[in-house]
Regions:
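A cross-family glycoside hydrolase active-site/sugar-binding cleft signature
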Residues: 15, 65, 117, 184, ...
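ATP-binding N-terminal substructure of ATP-dependent carboxylate-amine bond-forming enzymes
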Residues: 1-109, 122-130
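A structural signal for short, well-ordered beta-strand elements
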Residues: 43, 96, 121, 154, ...
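Acidic/histidine-enriched active-site and ligand-binding environments that engage anionic O-linkages
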Residues: 130-140
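Structural detector of well-ordered beta-strand residues that form the stable sheet scaffold
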Residues: 13, 63, 85-87, 115, ...
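ATP-dependent carboxylate activation and anion-phosphoryl transfer catalytic cores
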Residues: 1-7, 32-33, 55-57, 73, ...
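Diglycine-centered glycine-rich loop/turn motifs
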Residues: 91, 116-117
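A polyampholytic, Gly/Pro-enriched intrinsically disordered region
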Residues: 104-115, 136-138
Length: 433
């Protein structure tokens, strides 16, 4: 975000917690303001302190990034009330799409395919069991206000469903302050495909192609993303893209967002959810489209029109992103904290690294374990894979446990190279757990 602003000649203010005092973003910005102690609830989730920092520095807009308050409708609404531009969709859109059950209803009305599921929130265990008997096991329990894999349970029978409802509700309440859940048919061995959307405030909506995000841990955490999806033929790709645009128009979407789908074995696809923010994996779409999504977010928020239509979007080559995290794959991806004693980023043509770490940086225990995103672009998938393999062997991160070796193993896996990638790939092909 800071780099995009610098290229647009916009002054920046970084907010940081006491635990992030030495973080790179606070050094790169024109100004930096401490907004509280290290725990996120006292700093990055502290709306009053963030708004105060904006007032003190005279900031006219806030970019929420892709975590913490990025999909919090209350925060967006407060920004609107105090005349600070929230760089993202309106608070009403965030609230509407943030409730997964309500989003399902809206998609049904807009003729966007959805996975067969309950109409609204499950209120009783009996209702859930009746639905499961009608549709057939397995089913998946989902948090209505959820995301990031929390509040989700795949169940195979009545006993697991009863237990899963209680667990999912508890997780959802703890994570989102909302224990509501709903139930869907579980699509076995699907691909997770998402479409990058960009919409201005004048009614124009385009998509920048799809990303295959199927490589996930058992906790539904994405590890690798690529674009385009190897499983989509031109006809299916057009249908998925058109469905994503219908979804965005149905809710009156503005700014950058992502429409997520499950792709079944018979080329059927179903709406899952819409992420009302920029995604961690957005560089994949930037690499194949040549469009700087963060710059576009800022321009759209300033009221500018998109300078192109769908017919003008040209996607070229293949891009892959690996999320390198401070986790131990041998211990079910347990977080690792400590000091980065040595860091070397890969380089070369078609290689991009987005990272906040450096030699001597101390990983705080309070936040996400992401260390770096390595993104490689090639003329085709084979070249992108080779370039990523070379880059990950060149990359050095010492001092904490990382997923570097695990990512290297994924890239050398024969099934991955053939494009046979589904959401259970890591468990089935890599032996997770």
């Amino acid at each position: 975000v800071i780099r995009a602003c610098q290229e647009l000649d916009i002054e920046t203010v970084a907010v940081f917690s006491e635990g992030d005092r030495d973080a790179l973003h606070s050094r790169l910005a024109d100004q930096a303001v401490c907004i509280g102690p290290a725990p996120a609830r006292d700093s990055y989730l502290n709306v009053a302190n963030i708004i105060s920092a904006a007032f003190i520095t005279g900031a006219q807009a806030i970019h929420p990034g892709y975590g913490f308050l990025a999909e919090n409708p209350n925060f967006a609404e407060i920004c609107e009330r105090v005349n600070i531009k929230f760089i993202g969709p309106t608070s009403q859109v965030i609230e509407k799409m943030g409730n997964k059950a309500e989003a399902r209803k809206l998609m049904l009305e807009s003729e966007v395919p959805v996975v067969p599921g309950t109409e609204g929130i499950i209120s009783t265990e009996k209702d859930a069991i009746n639905f499961a008997h009608n549709i057939g096991y397995p089913v998946i329990i989902k948090a209505a206000a959820g995301g990031g894999g929390r509040g989700m349970r795949i169940v195979q029978n009545d006993t697991e469903l009863s237990q899963g409802l209680n667990t999912a509700r508890s997780e959802s309440e703890a994570a989102f302050g909302n224990g509501d859940v709903y139930v869907e048919k579980y699509i076995e061995e699907p691909r997770h495909v998402e479409v990058q959307i960009l919409a201005d405030e004048h009614g124009h909506v385009v998509h920048l192609g799809e990303r295959d995000c199927s490589l996930q841990t058992s906790r539904h955490q994405k590890m690798l993303e690529e674009s385009p999806c190897a499983a989509l033929n031109p006809s299916l790709r057009n249908r998925v893209g058109e469905a994503a645009i219908r979804a965005a128009k149905a809710v009156g979407y503005t700014n950058a967002g992502t429409v997520e789908f499950l792709l079944g074995s018979r080329n059927e696809f179903f709406f899952m959810e819409m992420n009302t923010r920029i995604q961690v994996e957005h560089p994949v779409s930037e690499m194949v489209s040549g469009i700087d999504l963060v710059k576009e977010q800022i321009r759209v928020a300033a009221g500018e029109r998109l300078g192109y239509r769908q017919r003008d979007v040209r996607l070229s080559g293949h891009a892959i992103e690996c999320r390198i995290t401070a986790e131990d794959p041998k211990k079910r991806f347990a977080p690792s904290v400590g000091k980065i004693t040595k860091y070397h980023a890969p380089g070369g043509i078609g290689v991009r690294v987005d990272s906040h770490i450096f030699s001597g940086y101390v990983m705080p225990p309070y936040y996400d374990s992401l260390l770096a995103k390595v993104i490689c672009h090639g003329h085709n998938r084979a070249e992108a894979i080779q370039r990523m393999q070379r880059s990950l062997h060149e990359m050095v991160i010492e001092g904490v446990k990382t997923t570097l070796s695990f990512h290297r193993s994924i890239l050398s896996n024969a099934f991955f190279k053939k494009g046979e990638v589904y959401t259970n790939f890591i468990k089935r092909r890599m032996g997770e757990g």
